[in-house]
Amino acid sequence: MSLRFHTLPTLPRAVKPGCRELLCLLVIAVMVSPSSSGLCPTACICATDIVSCTNKNLSKVPGNLFRLIKRLDLSYNRIGLLDADWIPVSFVKLSTLIVRHNNITSISTGSFSTTPNLKCLDLSSNRLKSVKSAMFQELKVLEVLLLYNNHISYLDPAAFGGLSHLQKLYLSGNFLTKFPMDLYVGRFKLADLTFLDVSYNQIASIPMHHINLVPGKQLRGIFLHGNPFVCDCSLYSLLTFWYRRHFNSVTDFKHDYTCRLWLDSRHSHQLLLLQDSFLNCSHSVINGSFHALGFIHEAQVGERAIVHCDGKTGNGNTDFIWVGPDNRLLEPDKDTGNFRVFYNGSLVIENPGFEDAGVYSCIAMNRQRLLNETVDIMINVSNFTINRSHHAHEAFNTAFTTLAACVVSIVLVLLYLYLTPCPCKCRDKRQKNALNQSNAHSSILSPGPTRDASAEDRKAGKRVVFLEPLKDPAVGQNGKVKLVPSKTVIAEGILKSSRAKSDSDSVNSVFSDTPFVAST
């Protein structure tokens, strides 16, 4: 006891200050580590925000996972019940949860309260038998739900209520006997659902009188192949209509659409639905309703717009009605403001405005064939005047720029041709030619060098011959050659004498004794 009493006071003095802080950190880490999140369990493989815990015989989610993961894979385990405690940690950033190939038989309310931001949930290949109401109510942003390869035989109408962002729903490989029309009509319909896979169930018929209520963009994504349909001309007409409309749900699985033709209560024969002359179904006995997407029509503000019903059932026995974006019924011979419907199905909009844009549904009802068809047509309204003035302004700017460039080019060419200044060499040459011409005229009148001139003076002087004889000399000139200095004179060279001449030396060539030599 005394030893302990004496050693405890000396312990703080024996530990250095730096080591003391390190020791405190180690103690805190050891105390917190069992309950801390962010560690990777031994049964999982972690890669930053992706965790895979597949085939590890788990019955629930490990509690020490990193809370900011975005993808969690729990496939091939033995999870059997999804309750409020099966995920002990709140994963606020988890967007993909995969729990396929487990033993899930039931899902309780609040099972996904810790994963509110899930966008993709995979519960395929389990043992679910039904989908009850409020089962997925916490998943407000869920976009993809996979429930294929279960034992589901019942879907509550409110099972998917609240999933306003759900786009894809996989229910293939279950035991459904009815087509889930509640997904498209009614209180709990899913407006964004564009893909529904109910293939390979136990659905024997399609509600033809309600399928026409499904919008065209959703109807295109319904997959029905692999179901044991009962052979019926209306079903054949429906699938043929989809096939001609190039719906991928039919064109990609053409040979998987079959039906059973019952010969008696015990024997049946399986037939391909999409084949020519199926059961000799004629157009007069077809009974069904179809819905498809039509074209996009462009209308201009204030200009009359005519929209035709893009239907395939129109003939003399067909009645047409239109439904506007505001659910207003437009019928022939009824006053509906600036709308008018003709008996051939055409819709005329007088003086359309921006408020008239939207999706218009044309419903064609064939009395002879008992066939209804609904076509959705998108009408866009734009202001053509504004667009036209804008384009006209751009065209004017382009034309003006081109014209200005042409005028500038022409002016530059004219300046180059007529206002180009003469170079100095050209000016000197002109002056020299003028000087030579004047000297040529004067040289005819100047006397030749005297005989008594010195040799140096003779060398310095230059003889010049500039005479051009007339071809027809005039009579009375004593055979003399008439000089015409005003004609063209060729000056071979004019060099002034180094000796300056006085005025007395210049005499008229007529009185000069020096003979003239005419050049021919």
UniProtKB/Swiss-Prot annotation:
Cytoplasmic side: 420-520
Residue ranges that the UniProt entry lists as topological domain Extracellular: 38-398
GO CC term, one of those recorded: nucleus
Domain LRRCT: 227-283
Protein's name according to its UniProt entry: Amphoterin-induced protein 2
Region (Disordered): 437-458, 498-520
Disulfide bridge map: C40-C46, C44-C53, C231-C259, C233-C281, C309-C362
Gene: Amigo2
Binding partners and assembly: Binds itself as well as AMIGO1 and AMIGO3.
Function: Required for depolarization-dependent survival of cultured cerebellar granule neurons. May mediate homophilic as well as heterophilic cell-cell interaction with AMIGO1 or AMIGO3. May contribute to signal transduction through its intracellular domain.
